[in-house]
């Protein structure tokens, strides 16, 4: 089964007429984790990313090829504490193939289904990684 991709939308800001020379870009996604080995294993398998261990107790996950807006790198750093409460920010993933088959694969890797008040008509599935960080698998990539 093909790995999932991280969804990101890239817009031509200049075309909006609001170009800002001081605008920033997302460089990477950073996740504070309690169990570094567990989370590196889960996210590298989920995304199909390569692992680079740091000397400081962290790990960098690199996408095949170069990081991009649709495939950013991930930095996992040990926090020593468990996650508390609902995420204020989460990842939306899109499968290269059948989204429900991808959900089953992710659950097999250690993800679990999460109820955040869905109505049942959503076009996504809410999951949590082994430490409880919520993320979604979209039925299809977002369009503008």
Regions found by a protein language model. Give the residues of each.
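Domain-length accessory/inserted modules outside core catalytic folds
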Residues: 61-63, 67-69, 74-86, 93-97, ...
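Charge-dense, helix-prone N-terminal extensions
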Residues: 45-51, 69, 82-85, 99-119, ...
């Amino acid at each position: 089964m093909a790995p999932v991709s991280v969804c990101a939308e890239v817009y031509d800001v200049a075309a909006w007429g609001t170009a800002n020379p001081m605008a920033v870009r997302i460089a990477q996604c950073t996740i504070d984790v309690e169990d570094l080995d567990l989370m590196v294993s889960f996210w590298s398998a989920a995304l199909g990313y390569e692992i680079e261990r740091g000397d400081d107790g962290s790990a960098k996950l690199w996408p095949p090829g170069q990081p991009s807006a649709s495939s950013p790198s991930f930095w996992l750093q040990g926090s020593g504490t468990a996650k508390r409460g609902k995420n204020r920010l989460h990842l939306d993933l899109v499968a290269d193939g059948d989204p429900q088959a991808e959900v089953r694969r992710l659950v097999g890797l250690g993800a679990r289904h999460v109820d955040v008040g869905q109505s049942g008509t959503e076009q996504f599935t809410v999951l949590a990684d082994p430490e409880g960080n919520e993320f979604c698998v979209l039925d299809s990539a977002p369009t503008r």
